[in-house]
Amino acid sequence: VLPYFKKSENQQRGASAYHGVDGELSVTDLISPAFVSQRFVDACVELGYDRNPDFNGVRQLGAGLYQSTIKDGKRHSTAAAFLLPIRQRSNLTITTGALVTRLLFKKTRVVGVEYLHSGMLHQVRVNQEVILSAGAYDSPQLLMLSGIGNAKYLQKLGISVVTDLPGVGQNLQDHVNVSVVRQTTQEINPAITSNGSEAGLFFNSEGNPKAAPDGQFFFGPGIYVPSGFNGPNQGFTGVVSLTRFQNIGSVSLRSSDPKDTPIIRMNYLQSEADVQKLVAGIRLMRKLFQSKAFNDFASKEIVPGPGVETDAALEAYI
């Protein structure tokens, strides 16, 4: 898929083996990263991790500043990049506020879609192809509503089976995140152009430099805590995230009615191994925040908190 990524990208740094400059989506360096974000990168290097100036390049392991999809000082979304510039084309119709109810078939080939709009059912048929891009929840829901999925399960709901494909909806994955938040006596006011998470670290928990990362840290200026938190407003936040994990969730149908929301089971933290990786990640984040790079911040931990030290206490926090 790399050629398609390059084709879609307008990389501020210029063209390379992994980046393109002729695409629609603007990708840039941070306009004004907070000085504390660079300190996070320095802390990672201090603990033995490599600097990585390009997470979307030849390798992902290491620490560095993230890039952003920004254009003219504003977020450059996929809609702004790909859709809005061509919305006047005569061969393009954009319909909003519509609910796709099922795919239309000719034998086992998808030839169109049926959708509900303003209380009326409509059908659109195509000569070429239908691209199903409805997200992690609605894509499997739509496939199953259309008869693609576990045949026995669909038949129980009264749905005619087109293709028996038991794996549909059975591979739901989501990153589990936990935060370490520290207060500081210094002002760390992020620029209004900040994307919140400015720096990061990709690492392999087993220390294998050739293996794919199974953990990721996000770091940014500012205190990110649940709403209703009453405390200091100067600080920084590190987020521990699992990029590979054992527990897989599922999406299943509540009924054969497209208007019924699907049943979503995330299965978060059902694996002890995943929980222990998060515990280890919190300990590593704390070690980074206690490194020389952060010495002059006179900071104290807000979350999980100085009294949360044992594995059991950290597991309870998670």
Residue ranges and their predicted role:
Residues 296-306:
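Short, glycine/acidic-rich hinge or "gate" loops at secondary-structure transitions
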Residues 176-283, 287, 312-318:
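FAD cofactor-binding and catalytic pocket of flavoenzymes
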Residues 52, 93-95, 160-164, 218:
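General small-molecule cofactor/ligand-binding pocket signal
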Residues 44, 157-160, 280-294:
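Internal hydrophobic alpha-helix adjacent to the cofactor/substrate pocket in enzyme cavities
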Residues 103-192, 255-256:
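Glycine-rich loop(s) and the adjacent beta-strand/alpha-helix scaffold that form part
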